[in-house]
């Protein structure tokens, strides 16, 4: 029996389409920090400047991708592993930069980017050392954030401090890790505001 060419072509196309659908893996799930809630407590001392330039955070290259990483401290603490089907919707360096800027702005300080700043304005630089979910056991994990903050006026270093925060994850999965890392980032933002409030920034 003769089969028309157009019917054959359609059948082949359907086979390829079905084969492509069957070969696809699970659809990735994307996470972020969620909306920035109002600050639970207002720092007793506010930053000593009305305007602060905050540069985007720097960090290792693996934090400049959307992959979510975790460590099995009970098995091999030196190895970081990516989740197979879970992603950040924005690289962690960008997520952390935006959350810190939001928290500083909530304290009443006007926040500018480096492209909008005038010469001589106080500049805050952030260098991120770690941003990962750490498993102590197969069922217990925490989110850990560690960074170094440096405050400059012109080319002069005013002060520098390292901040580190950890918080328990509500579940031993990527969702729990995302929530714990968001909470740890908020805690560091609060610590950062307290530190800024203790500094004396000389005038130009």
Residue ranges and their predicted role:
Residues 51-56, 71, 123-128, 144-150, ...:
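Soluble periplasmic/extracytoplasmic beta-strand elements of cell-envelope proteins
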Residues 69, 76-87, 156-194:
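Short secondary-structure boundary motifs at beta->alpha junctions and helix caps
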Residues 1-10:
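Bacterial N-terminal signal peptides that target proteins for export
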Residues 23-40, 106-154, 171:
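Surface-exposed short loop/turn segments
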Residues 101, 105-109, 193-201:
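Sec-exported extracytoplasmic/periplasmic mature domains
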Residues 17-20:
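C-terminal motif of bacterial Sec signal peptides marking the signal peptidase cleavage site
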Residues 22-92, 199-204:
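A structural "domain/chain start" motif
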Residues 83-108:
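Structured, soluble extracytoplasmic/luminal domains of envelope-associated proteins
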């Amino acid at each position: 029996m003769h089969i028309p060419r157009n019917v054959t072509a359609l059948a082949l196309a359907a086979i390829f389409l079905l084969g492509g659908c069957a070969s696809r893996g699970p659809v990735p799930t994307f996470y972020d920090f969620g909306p920035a809630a109002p600050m639970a407590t207002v720092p007793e001392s506010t930053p000593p400047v009305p305007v602060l330039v905050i540069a985007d955070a720097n960090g290792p290259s693996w934090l400049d991708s959307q992959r979510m990483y975790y460590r099995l401290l009970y098995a091999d603490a030196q190895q970081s592993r990516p989740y197979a089907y879970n992603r950040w919707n924005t690289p962690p360096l960008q997520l952390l930069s935006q959350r810190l800027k939001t928290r500083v702005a909530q304290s009443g300080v006007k926040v500018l980017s480096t492209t909008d700043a005038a010469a001589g304005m106080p500049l805050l630089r952030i260098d991120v050392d770690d941003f990962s979910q750490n498993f102590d056991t197969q069922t217990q994990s925490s989110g850990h954030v560690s960074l170094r903050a440096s405050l400059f006026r012109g080319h002069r270093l005013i002060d520098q401090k390292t901040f580190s925060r950890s918080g328990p994850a509500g579940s031993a999965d990527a969702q729990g890790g995302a929530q714990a890392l968001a909470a740890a980032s908020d805690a560091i933002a609060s610590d950062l505001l307290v530190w800024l409030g203790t500094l004396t920034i000389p005038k130009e």
